[in-house]
Amino acid sequence: GLYAELIQNRDFEYDPSDREGDKNWNSTHSWKLEGDNATFTINTSDPVHPNNPHYAVLNIQQPGAVLTNAGFDGIALQAGEKYDFSLFGRIPAGHKSNKLQVRLIDSNGTVQGEASITVSSRSWKTYKTVLTAKTAADTHLELQLQSVGEVELDMISLFPQNTFKGRKNGLRADLAQTLADIHPRFVRFPGGCVAHGDGLKNIYQWKNTIGPLEARKSARNLWGYHQSMGLGYYEYFQFCEDIGAEPLPVLAAGVPCQNSACHGDLRGGQQGGIPMSE
C-alpha cells in the first residue's frame, strides 16, 4: 500500500474479528518461529501502551532459533538503499541483556542486510539500527537471539529511508510520486465507507490515528484487514502539504455504511471537529 512499512503485523494486534472470525488472522499472523528449544508467545500483562496491548515474548533455551516475518508477500529491497529498523524491547526479571541479530534473507538463504542491537532495559525502550541492502532482492526478516534467555518485543518496524520527500514514518516514494504527478487539486481521506465503518465501535476515530505510533489505536475495517493507523491524519495532511493539494478530511456522520451495523445498531456518534488552523 501507500504506507511504507515493510513488516506485517508489526504490533501483534491482528485479531480474528478483523476477518469475520478467521482464527489464522491473529497476533502471530505473518510471524513464524523456526528452530528447536525455543518458544514464541503473546502476552498482554504489561504492554508498551494500553492502546497496543499485545506483545511478543521470545524465549531461547539453545541458540539457533529465529523469529521470521515475511512482510507483505515479501520484503523487496533496492540495492544500496538503507532501511531503518526499530522495535520496543524489554528484558523480563530473571534474564540478562541479550544481543539480537537482525537479518534480511533472500530465497537462496543469502544475507542481503544485517545489523544487531542489544536489548538490556528492564522497562520498555526503543532500539534502532540501520540495514543496507547488498543487492535488489525479495527477502524476509529474521531475528535471532545470540544467547540463552528471554526478551519481550513490540512495534517491530522496517522502513526504507527513501520515502516520499524523505519523511519519517512516510509514504512509498514510487506510489506517492505517482499521485503527485497527477497534480490533484485536493485529496480526500481516509475514505467514505472506511470512515463510517460497520457500527459505532468501528467508526474511524481520527484522534486514534495521531501521536506516537505505539499509542495509536488499531482497528479492523470493512475491507477485511487490519488498520495499524501508522498512516493517520497527520501523515495525510503532511502529504497534502508536500504535493500542494487541498486536504479534504472525512468525519463520520454517525450512520454506518450501507446499513451494515452489527446487530442492527445504527446509532452513531459525533466526533469533535478538527481545528483547521492546527
Could you tell me what each predicted segment is?
Residues 1-229, 241, 246-250, 261-274:
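Extracellular and organelle-lumenal recognition/adhesion modules and their flexible linkers in secreted
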Residues 175-176, 233-237, 278:
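Generic structural signal for well-ordered alpha-helices
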